[in-house]
């Protein structure tokens, strides 16, 4: 499945490039990755390298562990060089380290920072979970909309809307670095919910919040403005690693899940 995700940039200042142009600032080469597809033990990844300062053509090499050259490309413009790579889970994290090597026509070259892909794609815990509940009314009656997103964590990340009794109401597994968006009808009396984000490294959940606010007030008694955030939730953390059974049990998609309890915190 195609996953559009956002780029994660790692930039390292170079020690030398073309000595003939000393008036330029110290050149840099950046390396970035984008997860295109997720497999059980692999990731189809787009890696880009860019050195914007030296004049083209620029020769880019994608190198792996022990400086082994994986791919090479000559770019005649200032556009980044792109490399498609099937990154598979290795026994040693050191085997999944990549960096860009850029050289100009003068023969000078510069390296990028190292990308630790094992950490990025398999072992990075979910962190900095943010959840926002908003009451919206676009003419068809009020609906509660929730945005749930962790700022980092290895894919795939499963996001869940959970009631205070542990009942999982909705689940999504969004694209890498994209938020989960939940929408549901509010009940006539307030209820309590939280957002949970989980990957194969850990589980993190936000604090319980009442939706809509006002305790046990009736919906018609609540006079808060529509289309304004109800609450941005703080987070609690759990560093317990999920078992394959727990992680594999999550459902993918936007449908309602009945009779399922959330993973123990």
UniProtKB/Swiss-Prot annotation:
GO terms for biological process: adaptive immune response; cell surface receptor signaling pathway; immune response; mature B cell differentiation involved in immune response; positive regulation of immunoglobulin production in mucosal tissue. The keyword Signal applies. Residues 1-20 form the signal peptide. Keywords: Adaptive immunity, Cytokine, Glycoprotein, Immunity, Secreted, Signal. Expressed in fetal liver and bone marrow. Expressed in peripheral blood lymphocyte B cells. It comes from the Eukaryota. The keyword Glycoprotein applies. InterPro entries: IL-40-like_Ig. GO terms for molecular function: cytokine activity; transmembrane signaling receptor activity. Its main location: secreted. It comes from Homo sapiens (Human). Probable B cell-associated cytokine that plays a role in the regulation of humoral immune responses. Involved in lymphocyte B cell development and immunoglobulin/IgA production. It is found in: Secreted. Glycans are attached at residues 86, 132. This is Protein IL-40. GO terms for cellular component: external side of plasma membrane; extracellular space. It holds the Pfam family Ig_C17orf99.
């Amino acid at each position: 499945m195609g996953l559009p995700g956002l780029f994660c940039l790692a930039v390292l200042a170079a020690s030398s490039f073309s000595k003939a142009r000393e008036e330029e600032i110290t050149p840099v080469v950046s390396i970035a990755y984008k997860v295109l597809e997720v497999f059980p033990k692999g990731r189809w990844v787009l890696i880009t390298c860019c050195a914007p300062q030296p004049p083209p053509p620029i020769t880019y090499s994608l190198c792996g562990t022990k400086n082994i050259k994986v791919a090479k490309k000559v770019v005649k413009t200032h556009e980044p060089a792109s490399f498609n790579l099937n990154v598979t889970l290795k026994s040693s994290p050191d085997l999944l380290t990549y960096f860009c090597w850029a050289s100009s026509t003068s023969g000078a070259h510069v390296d990028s920072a190292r990308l630790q892909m094992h950490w990025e794609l398999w072992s990075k815990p979910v962190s900095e979970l943010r959840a926002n509940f908003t009451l919206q009314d676009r003419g068809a009656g009020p609906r509660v909309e929730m945005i749930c997103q962790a700022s980092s964590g290895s894919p795939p990340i499963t996001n869940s809307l959970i009631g205070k009794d542990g009942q999982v109401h909705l689940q999504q597994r969004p694209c890498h670095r994209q938020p989960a968006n939940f929408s549901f009808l509010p009940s006539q009396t307030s209820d309590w919910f939280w957002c949970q984000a989980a990957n194969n490294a850990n589980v993190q959940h936000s604090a319980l919040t009442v939706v809509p606010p006002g305790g046990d007030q009736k919906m018609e008694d609540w006079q808060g403005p529509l289309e304004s955030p109800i609450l941005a939730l703080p987070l609690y953390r759990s560093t317990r690693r999920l078992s394959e059974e727990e992680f594999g049990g999550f459902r993918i998609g936007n449908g309602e899940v009945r009779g399922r309890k959330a993973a123990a915190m």
